[in-house]
């Protein structure tokens, strides 16, 4: 979603410029199945997942995602790209991926929100609360309810500068 508007590329460029971390020159699209092929220590550190329609994974994909988040120490950044239904589907998916881990709301003073005076919401498709899933004191999944990818896209979806700047900051954190 929003790949044609360069949302992923813009976020990658912002991240490289503002953190000094080495990044790929361009974003990579990967399926959940492809995550299984990465050995421990070589998988992507973070996967961005967005959508607005149906979200369904096979049992094998659910197991792959569980392994990516726990054994391979990956992180999932999920962004509700357009519907209350996607919100429910994502939470249901996470109950299957991490059945013993309940989502927690992320307070504004949490380190993942460092440098942001407010939670940036472009469109509140999934409400106005961010959630995280924590395993062994590490955030393994972060859910953003408000279409952050639109703010990363070319033109920033017309949202005010403070909002899209905070969206980049959140993506970088």
Regions found by a protein language model. Give the residues of each.
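Aromatic-Pro/Gly-enriched surface loop or interdomain linker
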Residues: 1-46, 50-54, 148-149, 155-173
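Extracytoplasmic/secreted envelope proteins and their assembly/folding machinery
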Residues: 8-12, 62-66, 87-91, 171
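An acidic, glycine-rich "communication" segment
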Residues: 84-172
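Short alpha-beta junction capping motif
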Residues: 46-87
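Structural recognition of the beta-strand scaffold that forms the well-ordered cores
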Residues: 45-49, 75-79, 102-105, 140-144
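Alpha-helical scaffolding within the catalytic cores
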Residues: 28-36, 58-64, 125-129
